[in-house]
Amino acid sequence: MRLLWEEEAWEDYCLWQTRDKKLLKRINTLLKDIQRNTYEGTGKPEPLKGDLSGWWSRRIDVTHRIVYKEQDGNIIIASCFGHYSDT
């Protein structure tokens, strides 16, 4: 599956490249796992509710989450900084 980034999510990802290489590595590992197993695997995948119904999150660390959804064979990344309530 191909990764498609919302603009803010891509900016967050680029920020991680200069801010924290360890968390960037974790994000890259999670992204690969999402492409292989969209709804299972590392990072404790969980479906989101309410306004974010249809989206999923995975834990980068205690504070940060990747928020994504599968659509038309692609993975759309909405956020990779902060918590999904910040999205």
Regions from the language model: what does each represent?
Residues 36-39:
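Generic structural signal for secondary-structure transition and capping sites
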